[in-house]
Amino acid sequence: MRFLTALLALGVAFATPAQAAFPEKNIDFVIPYGPGGGFDTLTRKMIPYMEEYFAKQGSKISVVPVNMPGASGNKAAAFTSRSKPDGYTIQIFNIPGHGLGYITGKDSGYDITKMTWINQVGVDTYVVITSAAGDLKSIDNIMNLGRDIKVPEQGPGSTSNMANKIVWTTLGKGAEYIYGYKSSQEYATAVLRGDGDLTMVVVGSAKRYNKAGDYNVVAHFNAQVDPAFTNAVNGAALGKPELDEVNLLRMVAGPPGMSPEVTNTLHAALKYAIEHPELQKWAADTQNGV
């Protein structure tokens, strides 16, 4: 996709020197989903190291996480796009999820191509999870279920929903989607309650949610299946290697029109955070791609 290529090209440091006056007050870091999900977890992990970076530059400010779920992430993106472009409101974005309006020609309340792109902070792959207490122990079990599967989800604008639709359409399995959950943690929990049969989450989230062994991980769409998922298969094993290309990018942006000086400062703070040894260790331990 041309728009995605353009976004990635923007995720590089600017050559203009950082402006010393920024930041002078707290920065709001908008999270487009509810607490407990992958975007929320990564943002909160980065924040202390961003604050550490700013303190080293002489700015003892706080970076404040602001959860703003709604409309599959579009509520937050519309808010951020209308914020003052002074660097004090930034957001973590779901790509390609937040770009679906642009791709399909629908009005999402913001123009994804006009945001000020600051840095890429993560990439992740998807797994299919079912309840360990249920009968769906494998993809074969799912495909042989004598009805459409029920899939709890955030909504039709989310990347995980798009991933689910790609996977089940490609595999030829009918699906009924149950929308309205505010985070991946919520719709994963819905599977345990029996609201639905299965759902898809990214690898890092699956490992966090499955510490007690409540879930079966029946598929991992990646060239190499994570050794932690002993019963999982990938797209290649299912005869659909193209499914192993389905993934998610986490990118940070601000409103349209931010100055290069402020953007460069935020880029440096995010780079410091994602390259911090403690965050890298956490990412390796939890398989969160940063």
State the predicted function of each range.
Residues 46, 71-74, 87-100, 115, ...:
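Ligand-binding clamshell of periplasmic/extracellular solute-binding protein-like
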Residues 60-75:
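Early extracytoplasmic/lumenal segment of secretory-pathway proteins
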Residues 25-36, 63-65, 89-92, 148-153:
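Short, well-ordered beta-strand elements
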Residues 29-45, 69-72, 152-159:
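Extracytoplasmic "Venus flytrap"
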Residues 69, 152-233:
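Ligand-binding pocket segment of bilobal, Venus flytrap-like solute-binding proteins
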Residues 5-13:
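Bacterial N-terminal signal peptides
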Residues 21, 52, 56-59, 79-89, ...:
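Hinge/capping helix and adjacent helix->loop/strand transition within the periplasmic-binding protein
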Residues 14-20:
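Sec/Tat signal peptide C-region and signal peptidase I cleavage site
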